[in-house]
Amino acid sequence: MISMNISSNFDQNISRFHEILDVQKNFDIVYHTLTIADKKACLYFIDGFTKDEILLRLMQDFASVKPDSFPSSAHDFAKQYVHYGETTVETDDKNIFTQLLSGLSCLLIDGYDRAILIDCRTYPARGVSEPEKDKVLRGSRDGFVETMIFNTALIRRRIRDCLLYTSPSPRDRTRS
């Protein structure tokens, strides 16, 4: 991945994020397009790492922003309208992707040449263990026994790489 800074061109930033994160292949990388005070915005996060209640509150707060009181910088926007969790304003997309894959949410807003990183994460609280019903005779005895979202979050917690693709598809057992 070539490191470059975020630009103030929203569409260019979004196409770069979609290309690097490959949101079409990764079912656990979620993005929501929003409108904040007549400006286009996009919120990226990893499903299974974020607290839904905080994201809902953030989106409600974003809906209340008026065009005439819209801040001129990403720093000011973060101070005035992001009241939940810690925030960081970042320009280098390599750092942004590392933080995003570590569980932070990333907000891109049209006209800002910086991304707002919001820490509203929660980590899965279980290690990988042997499944009770599907014992194997040989090989690894590690298994995933929760939902696919939870299991993927357990993997992403350890492997923070844009090249880790996750796409749900049935394999050898049922194909259904």
Question: Which positions does each model-derived feature cover?
Answer:
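Mid-sequence acidic-hydrophobic segments that form the walls
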Residues: 99, 103, 154, 158-162
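Single conserved hydrophobic/aromatic residue that forms the stacking wall/gate
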Residues: 165-176
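N-terminal pre-transmembrane cytosolic regions of membrane proteins
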Residues: 1-115, 122-133, 137
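Glycine- and Gly-Pro-enriched alpha-helical subdomains that act as flexible
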Residues: 129, 133-138, 142-146, 150-153, ...
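Noncatalytic linker/hinge segments flanking ATPase motor cores
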Residues: 82-90, 145-154
